[in-house]
Amino acid sequence: MKALDYEGRRNISGERVRQKRTERKITQVELAARVQCEGVTLEQDAISRIESGQRMVQDYELRALSEVLGASMDWLAGKE
């Protein structure tokens, strides 16, 4: 099965995740730990791959990232 992509990326939210994370001065390790407190297991390397567009993002992961980063899911998905 071929991995889906959008303009060469496996997600549309990675750049926004990185933008919000750096605005909040949170490291990838800190973001991973905070997301885990939301009940979703994401390691630092997964955060890195999400931000670089190399990894798909599940809906429940996007919801946890949204909560931790203080951004709406729509904003992370580029709709706002």
Where are these regions (language model features)?
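Short helix-capping/hinge SLiMs at alpha-helix to coil transitions
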Residues: 8, 37-38, 53
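Short alpha-helical DNA-recognition segment
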Residues: 25-49, 64
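Hydrophobic micro-packing sites on short alpha-helices
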Residues: 31, 61-66, 76-77
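Short, basic-rich loop-to-helix N-cap that marks the start of a DNA-contacting helix
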Residues: 45, 52-67
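Residues that mark the N-terminal boundary/hinge immediately upstream of a DNA-recognition element
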Residues: 16, 27, 43, 58-61, ...
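Residues in the recognition helix of alpha-helical DNA-binding motifs
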Residues: 20, 34, 50, 79
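Short, contiguous strand/loop micro-motifs
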Residues: 4-5, 48-50
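A short, Lys/Arg-rich alpha-helix, primarily the initiator
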Residues: 1-24, 74
